[in-house]
Amino acid sequence: MNCPYCSHPDSKVIDSRDVDDGVRRRRECVVCGQRFTTYERFQPAGLFVVKKDQRREEFNKEKLLSGLRRACEKRPLPAGAVDKVAGDIEAELYNMGKAEIPSTLLGDMVMERLKMLDNIAYVRFASVYREFTDITQLKKVVDNLVNGQDEGIHKGQLSLLPEDKAAPKTRYQRR
């Protein structure tokens, strides 16, 4: 590592600490004596997404986050939920050990997680990802969500449609 002050290539490590996703090292130049900090992070091997038209594009977590944020915009989700979904998807993709993954696999992973997270975000993402051309396709997705609601809704998730309110109970007056 070259010294940022005198550009000498030698330095000694004074302190080394683990940080969130790597190692922080405090260094001292052996020539000028100036101290500086370096960060080392693991850089996974390149992962490419194969698009529908067979183009290959390097996986970009920021692009994934952007799509997730757009789908979850103005939804009452817990702080960090979108980042966690993106991180989980990224980890799963790298754990597959493949150099290339089809964009359809990535889209299906996003759909699966959004369905568990928030139905509205799921429908928003599905409408773009599945390229709906008319309202009947959207209605079909919503109907599937409503019909399979018992297994699909998780604790804390907002309902897609308002729940039916039970008939008010009749109160009898005492005589």
Curated annotation (Swiss-Prot):
<dbReference type="GO" id="GO:0005524">
    <property type="term" value="F:ATP binding"/>
</dbReference>
<keyword id="KW-0863">Zinc-finger</keyword>
<feature type="zinc finger region">
    <location>
        <begin position="3"/>
        <end position="32"/>
    </location>
</feature>
<dbReference type="InterPro" id="IPR005144">
    <property type="entry name" value="ATP-cone_dom"/>
</dbReference>
<keyword id="KW-0862">Zinc</keyword>
<feature type="domain" description="ATP-cone">
    <location>
        <begin position="47"/>
        <end position="137"/>
    </location>
</feature>
<dbReference type="InterPro" id="IPR055173">
    <property type="entry name" value="NrdR-like_N"/>
</dbReference>
<dbReference type="Pfam" id="PF03477">
    <property type="entry name" value="ATP-cone"/>
</dbReference>
<dbReference type="GO" id="GO:0003677">
    <property type="term" value="F:DNA binding"/>
</dbReference>
<protein>
    <recommendedName>
        <fullName>Transcriptional repressor NrdR</fullName>
    </recommendedName>
</protein>
<comment type="function">
    <text>Negatively regulates transcription of bacterial ribonucleotide reductase nrd genes and operons by binding to NrdR-boxes.</text>
</comment>
<keyword id="KW-0678">Repressor</keyword>
<dbReference type="Pfam" id="PF22811">
    <property type="entry name" value="Zn_ribbon_NrdR"/>
</dbReference>
<dbReference type="InterPro" id="IPR003796">
    <property type="entry name" value="RNR_NrdR-like"/>
</dbReference>
<keyword id="KW-0547">Nucleotide-binding</keyword>
<dbReference type="GO" id="GO:0045892">
    <property type="term" value="P:negative regulation of DNA-templated transcription"/>
</dbReference>
<keyword id="KW-0804">Transcription</keyword>
<keyword id="KW-0805">Transcription regulation</keyword>
<comment type="similarity">
    <text>Belongs to the NrdR family.</text>
</comment>
<dbReference type="GO" id="GO:0008270">
    <property type="term" value="F:zinc ion binding"/>
</dbReference>
<keyword id="KW-0479">Metal-binding</keyword>
<keyword id="KW-0067">ATP-binding</keyword>
<keyword id="KW-0238">DNA-binding</keyword>
